[in-house]
């Protein structure tokens, strides 16, 4: 359990750095959308961010922030697998884990996803268009982190026998 908590802390630290560069992230997505002639659709999946990065990103600063986003998403996905291996779960932890796995799935539609208080990521977006186009993608990481913290909190309340069962 300590190992997953440490992994989560590490991801949270990377996310804090990413969060400080949210305007750069939005600018990178905006330029990629312009290069792709795709200004109508919102950013709707991790897969779309990956495609923009690979095919339409021609600026090293923008590429760096898009890579940072992709790396955090990849680490969250790996942590989901680690959670799954830790114990067989309860209905509550299984539900939280399924939500996390769905959210970090490459093709999951993020367009309607919005982080709520205390997360201010959507509020930091400049206008309605930005909120409509980027609200889901900027909400993804804080929502998944919240679900993971909740998973850990529920898992820590389980009897040791249940936790050990998952590792045998």
Curated annotation (Swiss-Prot):
Origin superkingdom: Eukaryota
InterPro entries in UniProt: SPACA9
Disruption outcome: Deficient mice are viable, fertile, and have no clear phenotypic differences from wild-type mice.
One Pfam family, short name: SPACA9
GO CC annotations, alphabetized: acrosomal vesicle; axonemal microtubule; axonemal microtubule doublet inner sheath; ciliary basal body; ciliary base; cytoplasm; cytoplasmic microtubule; nucleus
Function: Microtubule inner protein (MIP) part of the dynein-decorated doublet microtubules (DMTs) of multiciliated respiratory cells and the distal singlet microtubules of monoflagellated spermatozoa. Forms an extensive interaction network cross-linking the lumen of axonemal doublet microtubules.
Name the UniProt record assigns to this protein: Sperm acrosome-associated protein 9
Lineage: Eukaryota, Metazoa, Chordata, Craniata, Vertebrata
């Amino acid at each position: 359990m300590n190992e997953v908590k440490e992994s989560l802390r590490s991801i949270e630290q990377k996310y804090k750095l990413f969060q400080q560069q949210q305007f750069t992230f939005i600018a990178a997505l905006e330029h990629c959308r312009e290069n792709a002639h795709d200004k109508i659709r919102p950013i709707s999946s991790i897969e779309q961010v990956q495609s923009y990065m690979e095919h339409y990103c021609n600026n090293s600063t923008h590429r760096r922030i898009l890579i940072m986003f992709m790396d955090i998403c990849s680490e969250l996905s790996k942590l989901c697998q680690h959670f799954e291996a830790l114990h067989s779960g309860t209905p509550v932890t299984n539900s939280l884990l399924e939500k996390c796995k769905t959210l970090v799935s490459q093709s999951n539609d993020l367009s309607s996803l919005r982080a709520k208080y205390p997360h201010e990521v959507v509020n930091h977006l400049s206008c309605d268009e930005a909120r409509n186009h980027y609200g889901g993608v900027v909400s993804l990481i804080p929502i998944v982190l919240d679900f993971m913290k909740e998973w850990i909190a529920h898992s820590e309340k389980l009897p040791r026998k249940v936790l050990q069962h998952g590792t045998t």
